[in-house]
Amino acid sequence: MILLAVVAFLFALIGAGFIVRRLRGHARRYGKDLPQRFHMGHIPRLGGLAMFASMVLTVGAAGLQNWWGYYSNALHWNTWVLYFFIAMLPAVAGGIAEDMTQRMTVRYRLVLTLATGLLAVYLLGMTVPRLGLGWLDALLSAAPWLGMALAVLAIAGLPHAFNIIDGYNGLASMVTVLMLF
């Protein structure tokens, strides 16, 4: 798994480097008066594309490891992995479209992340079965659809919450990593 983490880092580094170097021309269309433009030069806003491509390539590398017989317990290809990527597609496509056009409304992006949440619940069985409070756990047990609704709300809401926090300087990534551990 350490090797896969290193491979994922390298894929992300190479992908982000490629995007920054090769797609500068696209970044010229971003208005210079926007509050996000505090850096010098033209920097494209397609980091999500590099991260998604890194995930796909890393899972592919893990599949090759298994196929070649190395580290057979690293990651097993199954329908869950395929469903995971299918569930992510609406949110990823919306993020890339927003980065490319800067014309998507927040409502439309929220609909796409809600679609991702619904797909995650449907395809992956994501739910919130318990919260650690007896009375609330009893309610979630009696009405499992509430746990599904909470999962959809979390999947749809967290990216927007972190985007609001992140806003201008990109410092929310470390806060996100610490919170989700």
Give the residues covered by each predicted segment.
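"…together with the soluble PPM/PP2C metallo-phosphatase catalytic core" -> "…together
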Residues: 1-181
